[in-house]
UniProtKB/Swiss-Prot annotation:
The gene is ispH. InterPro entries: LytB/IspH (IPR003451). It catalyses: isopentenyl diphosphate + 2 oxidized [2Fe-2S]-[ferredoxin] + H2O = (2E)-4-hydroxy-3-methylbut-2-enyl diphosphate + 2 reduced [2Fe-2S]-[ferredoxin] + 2 H(+); dimethylallyl diphosphate + 2 oxidized [2Fe-2S]-[ferredoxin] + H2O = (2E)-4-hydroxy-3-methylbut-2-enyl diphosphate + 2 reduced [2Fe-2S]-[ferredoxin] + 2 H(+). This is 4-hydroxy-3-methylbut-2-enyl diphosphate reductase. Pathway: Isoprenoid biosynthesis; dimethylallyl diphosphate biosynthesis; dimethylallyl diphosphate from (2E)-4-hydroxy-3-methylbutenyl diphosphate: step 1/1; Isoprenoid biosynthesis; isopentenyl diphosphate biosynthesis via DXP pathway; isopentenyl diphosphate from 1-deoxy-D-xylulose 5-phosphate: step 6/6. NCBIfam families: ispH_lytB (TIGR00216), PRK01045.1-2 (NF002188), PRK01045.1-4 (NF002190).
Amino acid sequence: MHNAIYTGLQKEVEVILATPRGFCAGVSRAIEIVKLAIEYYKDTKTIYVLHEIVHNKYIVETLKTMGVIFIDKVDQAQDGSVLIYSAHGVSKSIKQLAELRDLEVIDATCPLVNKVHKEVQLYDKSGYQVILIGHKGHREVEGTVGQISTPVIIVQNLNDIDKIEIFDPDKLAYVTQTTLSVDDTKVIIDKLKKKFPNIKGPDLKDICYATQNRQTTTKRLAELVDIVFILGSKNSSNSNRLKELAAIQTQAFLIDSYKEIDLNLLNDITKIGITAGASAPDILVQQVIDFLKQHMKVKLSDLEIVQESVTFNVPRQLRQYKEQYNPI
């Protein structure tokens, strides 16, 4: 697509990079877990990952070349192998299935997703009916709903609130998916509170710090540029939210790589914004910059709204090995 009829080799553009962008702590941890497992169990056990470890095509394809096998069901894993749960988390029934098998299980669920799982379990234990604000069919939502045997009500939008059937308005609680739009979720929470004044919930605290930071930065970035490219896969929830936010202000495109950029879009553009979803590696951003430099004069600048320093440790079973080995 990018090698069309574009002729602007001498064109000058400013490319503004959003900071923070790309990997969050949960994604970094999940990828590190898989890479440590590859080294630790090298030549002794097959490594299976249940679902995509993170929703990014480049990462999944890279790990496949390192020998990782991605599966959709526990029974696809061979006995005596290693099974890693993705960063999005899994239901209790999946964990129970895995326990019945001869598998070495490693849980790469993001700690912030685990926090939501615990909230659901506590509310359920205390007799509350649970509402989950999130996207039906997303892996994280499936895992969260599957933490309890009682049905969880999924609210995707304002209209869903009108259809809610509840048992007791005084025993109602909500949690949220961690990768939602902060602005959209606030509107949904406000309507829930108006309809059910005694509802309990974490406000916006379930939406992870990295999601919030990337959304804040992307909104500001979109105000400064003529077009925004968001590096991320189409099935990445947080990347889609960044595209939606940027599109309120300017042209916005969610791309897996520089190969999806149509240079003809840039004919009248002087400022380009680039950011990346929480599961997109920075090499993809660098490739976009290199690609643009081949076709125009690029002046690079940074837009840094907030600094991030959050890190999460790997599971205990890999921690000792990590001290002896630094993953690729």
